[in-house]
């Protein structure tokens, strides 16, 4: 085999390998582009050709992977949120510590992994457009809301079983936890994006404050005492003053 033919074969193999790698990466690139546009513009205003253009492919290529804009949206939700529930359930199962600690950990972890990311804009999108797209709202309820509530219900039940939490109306106590987190998302993707920099709403301080308020309502007296001790800043060690004995002053 001549050298030129060997070089040509190697070039073709490299080109094929590069094309295959590009093909494998394409669904992820489309999902990233779709997430960006859905959060920026909303579901109704985002056009399939815009997603394709941002991902650097044709509209026909987009529909090879995702047959409709609705299926594309569902894939975005699964990739960024609902696909993580298995991982979160595993973390729940092995968590060591009190349920008060677990509640604080879950709220802060949720913010770091979802709330602080672009994916949190999906929640705002659903809240804004659910009435116009009931099928997508039902999908989000099934894929995100229901499993999320199931994990919170398990956490609250854990607290009641251990005696840390008082007897709760579980179905409604869940909303005491989700409501402040939903507010934080809505603020981030609405007024928070418009107000001057330095607006006094630090997400981590807000979550710590909400967790403390929640625990005051959820905990039994003994559980609240332990939670307060855990959260209270450590006082400086007391110093002891030794007075001289009489006659030795």
Predicted segments with their positions:
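Conserved hydrophobic residue
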Residues: 43-44, 136, 165
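Amphipathic alpha-helical linker/stalk segments
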Residues: 76-118, 122, 157
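Short secondary-structure transition hinges
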Residues: 86, 112-153, 198-200
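Hydrophobic/aromatic residues within well-ordered alpha-helical segments
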Residues: 26, 69, 80-84, 99, ...
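Basic, helix-initiating cap at the start of DNA-binding domains
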Residues: 1-41, 45-57, 64-71, 97
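A conserved beta-strand->loop->alpha-helix hinge within the catalytic CA
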Residues: 50, 97-102, 169, 202
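C-terminal peripheral helix-coil segments that are non-catalytic and often amphipathic
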Residues: 1-17, 101, 105, 109, ...
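Amphipathic, non-transmembrane alpha-helical scaffold segments
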Residues: 23, 31, 77, 137, ...
